[in-house]
């Protein structure tokens, strides 16, 4: 696989993540209706990883990779970033407007560039930095100017964005030294175990809500879709393909997710179409085109 093929594969991942945003909103709406927002978020994340990892042992090479200690060590690192980011985002998403959530989550693009600049003691190329600015603006304004209040859901989303940036950088490092398929399985499995531990504590407070959500089709349908497409398919492609791209280039590409999420939200009547979609979406696309001018990473 070459960098261009990897870019196309990860482009497909952004479309999957756009759908995942819709499924997530639906599931959290149901959980909030039962008065179990935090429990619902933990349950969703836990089962999303657990169900998404069930099919991975069927892939060739996974069982052999599972015997390597390094696969589990690196999988634990990815799991911490991944589980924390998704959980913080889900807990906060019900309290935020789509515009604010999209903008604050998109800060992972900036965080990725800043963390790498601090790590390597130099800035990225001019093309990548311009792409970072454009996609951050585009993600924030795709549904109108975000109205920030600096409350706890917003700070929680910012923390989630920081963890997503850590996951992007860690993925670049980890998938170069251990089996990408093996670390996909170990990270998903460990993330599910983290969720299970947290879920056990929350069940002490709301034991009845768990059974109600597990019997609710409106909660289970988006959960199953997210588990297969958002976890099994998307994370497998990320771990196989991202190492062929610069981490900042990958972060810029991932920022296309709000375009698909907004278009889908419009089609389902969740939001209305307006000129901000053209402005924000145009900035996101332009940012990716500018980033393509940056020197490509060697695919070897």
Question: PLM ranges: what are they?
Answer:
Residues 56, 124-144, 164, 275-295:
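Hydrophobic transmembrane alpha-helices of multi-pass small-molecule transport proteins
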């Amino acid at each position: 696989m070459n960098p261009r093929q990897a870019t196309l594969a990860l482009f497909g991942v952004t479309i999957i993540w756009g759908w995942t945003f819709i499924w997530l909103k639906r599931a959290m709406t149901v959980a909030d209706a039962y008065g179990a927002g935090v429990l619902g978020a933990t349950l969703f994340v836990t089962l999303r990883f657990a169900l998404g990892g069930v099919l991975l042992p069927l892939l060739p090479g996974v069982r052999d990779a599972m015997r390597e200690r390094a696969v589990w060590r690196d999988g634990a690192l990815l799991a911490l970033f991944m589980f924390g980011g998704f959980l913080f985002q889900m807990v906060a998403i019900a309290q935020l407007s789509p515009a604010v959530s999209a903008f604050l989550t998109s800060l992972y693009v900036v965080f990725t560039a800043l963390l790498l600049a601090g790590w390597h003691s130099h800035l990225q190329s001019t093309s990548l930095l311009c792409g970072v600015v454009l996609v951050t603006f585009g993600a924030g304004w795709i549904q109108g100017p975000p109205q920030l209040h600096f409350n706890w859901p917003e700070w929680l989303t910012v923390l989630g964005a920081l963890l997503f940036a850590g996951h992007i950088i860690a993925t670049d490092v980890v998938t170069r030294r251990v089996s990408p398929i093996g670390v996909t399985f170990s990270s998903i499995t460990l993330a599910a175990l983290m969720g299970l531990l947290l879920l056990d504590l929350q069940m002490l407070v709301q034991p009845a809500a768990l059974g109600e959500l597990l019997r609710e089709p409106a909660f289970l349908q988006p959960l199953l879709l997210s588990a297969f497409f958002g976890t099994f398919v998307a994370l497998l492609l990320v771990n196989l393909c991202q190492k062929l791209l610069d981490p900042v280039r990958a972060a810029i590409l991932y920022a296309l997710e709000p375009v698909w999420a907004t278009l889908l939200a419009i089609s389902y009547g969740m939001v209305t179409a307006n000129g901000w979609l053209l402005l924000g979406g145009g900035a996101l696309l332009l940012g990716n085109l500018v980033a393509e001018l940056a020197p490509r990473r060697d695919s070897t």
